[in-house]
Amino acid sequence: MDMTSRMTSHFRDAMALCEQSMQALSEPLAGAVELLFAALANNGRILACGNGGSAADAQHFVAELVGRFERDRLPLAGIALNTDTSILTAVGNDYGFDEIYERQVNALGQPGDVLVAISTSGNSPNVVRAMEAARDREMHVIALTGKGGGVMGELITPHDVHLCVPHDRTMRIQEIHILLLHALCDGIDALLLGDTE
């Protein structure tokens, strides 16, 4: 395959997955918007976490909440749990990497808050433990996964939302994850500021 054809195949694969994801995830995505909006309307907070590219997605999502998405509005209460290197290194050193998010959820999370947990495999132990801590603290969880959902998919309760991308390739899952996070931001803004579309 020549390089142009190889590059073209990325667009074709992404478009096909966008269509599949639209069919599978539009309804639960709308439910996730309602969950986030309800938490914010009740003075709750949104915590987000992930590893690697998913950590970057968590940070990106929270930046859109605290800053703005496309329209000016008041800042929204969001915390990316992967951004404080002192906490991450202290907890990682003293308790182990698997606890870096769990301890923060236990410290910061309150009943009615929402944890946005991101893992392309659904099996990241530290994100799984964050979900378990969120459940113990009577928080809601929005899990962004792929590859069938893994352990995180098994932890989802009727009070949570699972956004599982129907694909096994990590980069394609990550591409849909950022689309989902942007859609969540748009939905929150539509409920806060009115629908402009």
From Swiss-Prot:
Gene name per UniProt: gmhA
Primary localization: cytoplasm
Annotated positions binding substrate: N51, G52, G53, E64, N93, D94, S119, T120, S121, S124, Q174
UniProt keyword tRNA processing, yes or no: no
Subunit structure and binding partners: Homotetramer.
Record's keyword terms, sorted: Carbohydrate metabolism, Cytoplasm, Isomerase, Metal-binding, Zinc
EC numbers, comma separated: 5.3.1.28
Gene Ontology annotations for the cellular component aspect, listed alphabetically: cytoplasm
Co-factor: note: Binds 1 zinc ion per subunit.
Localization per record: Cytoplasm
GO MF entries: carbohydrate derivative binding; D-sedoheptulose 7-phosphate isomerase activity; zinc ion binding
Something else known: The reaction produces a racemic mixture of D-glycero-alpha-D-manno-heptose 7-phosphate and D-glycero-beta-D-manno-heptose 7-phosphate.
Domain of life: Bacteria
Cofactor(s) needed by this chain: Zn(2+)
Any GO BP annotation: D-glycero-D-manno-heptose 7-phosphate biosynthetic process
Pathway, per record: Carbohydrate biosynthesis; D-glycero-D-manno-heptose 7-phosphate biosynthesis; D-glycero-alpha-D-manno-heptose 7-phosphate and D-glycero-beta-D-manno-heptose 7-phosphate from sedoheptulose 7-phosphate: step 1/1
Name of the top EC class for this enzyme: isomerase
Name of the molecule in the record: Phosphoheptose isomerase
Record lineage: Bacteria, Pseudomonadati, Pseudomonadota, Betaproteobacteria, Burkholderiales
Binding residues annotated for Zn(2+), in chain numbering: H60, E64, Q174, H182
Function, as annotated: Catalyzes the isomerization of sedoheptulose 7-phosphate in D-glycero-D-manno-heptose 7-phosphate.
Matches recorded under NCBIfam families: PRK13936.1
Pfam families per the UniProt record, alphabetical: SIS_2
Reaction catalyzed: 2 D-sedoheptulose 7-phosphate = D-glycero-alpha-D-manno-heptose 7-phosphate + D-glycero-beta-D-manno-heptose 7-phosphate
